């Protein structure tokens, strides 16, 4: 199977980084449990763009720690012969640091793609399954005929309850939920 896997809030807990940058730069706390929609409305669009850009600098990328079980699960899938496409809504300038991070954490992959056209890229390269936290990407992938899965977050809880999305609280649960799909 051809699997695409997002990075931020999928392979690692991104929200803490975004919150720290928001507090430092703008004095605005971004409570994780209160983020029940995809849009971050506590920041102005220009502030959010600046905060996200800062979290995608080399220093922040390399400081990220993967979720427990994420690397081991992806490694097992890769060793079982599944194609692993790592995809992130990051500017092209973040590619080298992202590649360095993936190497540092020991996550094997076949392709890394940093861009803002995630679902169309998945369609272009024949991805079967997208693992992502964004309800926008999950809906787009469903509409494109892909299977979808996610790590459960406050902002994607609704899509987990209303759409055909495999949802799990953590990577151990996600691996178990996807086992029959990947068999």
Predicted stretch roles:
Residues 56-86, 91-97:
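Short, acidic loop-to-helix structural element flanking the phosphoryl-transfer center
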Residues 1-50:
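Active-site neighborhood of HAD-like aspartate-dependent phosphohydrolases
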């Amino acid at each position: 199977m051809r699997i695409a896997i997002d990075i931020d809030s999928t392979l690692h807990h991104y929200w803490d980084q975004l919150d720290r940058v928001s507090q430092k730069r703008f004095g605005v706390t971004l409570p994780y449990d209160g983020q029940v929609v995809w849009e971050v409305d506590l920041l102005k669009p220009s502030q959010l763009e600046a905060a996200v850009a800062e979290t995608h600098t080399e220093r922040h990328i390399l400081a990220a720690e993967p979720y427990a079980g994420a690397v081991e699960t992806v490694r097992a899938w890769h060793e079982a012969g599944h194609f692993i496409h790592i995809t992130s809504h990051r500017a092209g300038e973040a590619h080298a640091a992202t590649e360095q991070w993936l190497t540092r954490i020991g996550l094997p992959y076949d392709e890394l793609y940093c861009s803002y056209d995630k679902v169309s890229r998945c369609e272009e390269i024949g991805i079967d399954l997208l693992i992502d936290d964004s309800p926008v990407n999950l809906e787009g992938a469903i509409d494109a005929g892909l299977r979808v899965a996610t790590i459960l977050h406050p902002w994607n809880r609704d899509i987990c309850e209303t759409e055909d999305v495999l949802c799990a609280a953590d990577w151990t649960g996600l691996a178990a939920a996807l086992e029959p799909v990947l068999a």
